[in-house]
Amino acid sequence: MTSVPAGAISKRDNVVVFDTTMRDGEQSPGASMSLEEKLELAKILEEMGVDVIEAGFPIASNGDFEAVRQIAELITESTVCGLARAAAGDIDRCAEAVRRAKRGRIHTFISTSPVHMKYKLQMEPDAVLEAITRSVSHARNLVGDVEWSAEDATRTERDFLKRCVEAAIKAGATTINLPDTVGYSYPSEYGELFRDVITSVPGADKAIFSAHCHNDLGLAVANSIAAIEGGARQVEVAINGIGERAGNAALEEIVMALRVRGDHLPYGTSVDPVHITRASRYVSAITGFPVQFNKAIVGKNAFAHESGIHQDGMLKNAETYEIMKPEDVGQGATNLVMGKHSGRHAFREKLKALGYELGQNALNDAFGRFKELADKKKHVFDDDIVALVDDALARGSEKIRVSRLRVVAGTDGQSAELTLDIDGVASTAEATGDGPVDAVFNAIHKIVPHSAALRLFQVHAVTEGTDAQAQVSVRLEEDGRIATGAAADTDTLTASAKAYVNALNNLFARKEKSRPEAAIASGF
């Protein structure tokens, strides 16, 4: 079965795609992103055609406020949204953050389930209703686009939920979100919830209804699709499905489910899926969260066929075992071989096919790094090129660079001699360790003393073969600050050194820019 052409679905039938990778996605333990990484991700999301970018929770910290503010100034096509509790201070801070957005939105929420009202809010239902009216009205006086969410909607008493929705719409909410906050619902009951609320609440036709599903039972995507069947016209999603606990509904899965199965649900999205793989890999690189090999749409094996019977069918007609083309999501039709004899024009066209449009300086830099890699490898595959470019994108401020590394390993121990370039000045140190990687990291510590603790060290081969590139992710933590670094190289130890140094660069940049923060976590 082939995908429905993007132009076959009219704009009025589109489902609004609301991306919360930088807000709910960042609430995944260890998934903290720097300001520079968020700005780059925002550009990727806008280029993809994402309708709404939830850029952060402005009252939570100065860092979140600044991210929302700068993204609001940067983005011109997508709506930029900030999150706020049902409190005037939250809403005012959010309004200030999105003030310069061409299209700005305030997303305010309050819990509505009995367990949340009793134990979390310690509020009576009537007080919650008053808070909804007060907060939504206040937000609507500041911006024209206000979303209201009933936190823990799927465990809320139905009649009370309808009263809350009616109050929010009367107060001026333009979008109503009914989140499955704890991933509790089944698709049939979640779809029925939307049908019931939309058909029975007065004024429901004045608002767009939205689904926000968590994946605690592995049903986030199925529930989101069921909500669309029930009348929802916005879905709240995250790249790679990252988010609190088991994560959110995955953007890539919902977008492609709607595109491939247009015969079942005649609704499209504004997202150009050719950018999906690039976005997935970038988010994986900056968070250090690997994408499982069998992950739908973006996993390494999503378009792999090993069975002889399957391969035979694919050679005769790809539709025998593929319901979409890998090119549709930016994975490239085949692993075309690129090598040291490939020219700049071929390299540029390959980047375009993989979803990258680089400026001339960035292209020249990437091409030079590609030629260096091609001299080390017999064949350079699509995944090698993606890792090479994403490695450059993932790097933050580069005050420190790896200049030279020599490792000696033997039965009597391992030692590393490392030279780092720090603001143009070379510094060299030797160190031993419990293994070659430990020796390399100890050498870095000798040159750049720090108190950061290593929280993650992860290595995987980008492609197959003994000359495959190693992609390394490192996560450091110091005084509550978390920084991630990623690097790729044909030599695992060199990649490890570069990843550690990239993490240090990001950590030091974050320390320089940090101000006192009040960490406030949102529930859904």
Curated annotation (Swiss-Prot):
Origin: domain of life: Bacteria
Protein's name according to its UniProt entry: 2-isopropylmalate synthase
UniProt enzyme class: transferase
SMART domains on file: LeuA_dimer
One term of GO molecular function: 2-isopropylmalate synthase activity
Family: Belongs to the alpha-IPM synthase/homocitrate synthase family. LeuA type 1 subfamily.
GO CC, any one term: cytosol
Cofactor(s) needed for function: Mn(2+)
Stretches the record annotates as Regulatory domain: 401-524
Gene3D superfamilies recorded: 3.30.160.270, Aldolase class I
One GO term (biological process): L-leucine biosynthetic process
Catalytic activity, EC: 2.3.3.13
Organism: Caulobacter vibrioides (strain NA1000 / CB15N)
Coiled coil (residue ranges): none
Major localisation: cytoplasm
Keywords from the named record: Amino-acid biosynthesis, Branched-chain amino acid biosynthesis, Cytoplasm, Leucine biosynthesis, Manganese, Metal-binding, Transferase
Pathway: Amino-acid biosynthesis; L-leucine biosynthesis; L-leucine from 3-methyl-2-oxobutanoate: step 1/4
Keyword RNA-binding: no
Annotated binding of Mn(2+), by residue: 24, 212, 214, 248
Boundaries of every Pyruvate carboxyltransferase domain copy: 15-275
Subcellular compartments: Cytoplasm
Described function: Catalyzes the condensation of the acetyl group of acetyl-CoA with 3-methyl-2-oxobutanoate (2-ketoisovalerate) to form 3-carboxy-3-hydroxy-4-methylpentanoate (2-isopropylmalate).
Catalytic function, reaction form: 3-methyl-2-oxobutanoate + acetyl-CoA + H2O = (2S)-2-isopropylmalate + CoA + H(+)
InterPro entries named in the record: 2-IPM_HCS-like, 2-isopropylmalate_synth_dimer, AIPM/Hcit_synth_CS, Aldolase_TIM, LeuA/HCS_post-cat, LeuA_allosteric_dom_sf, LeuA_bact_synth, PYR_CT
HAMAP family per record: LeuA_type1
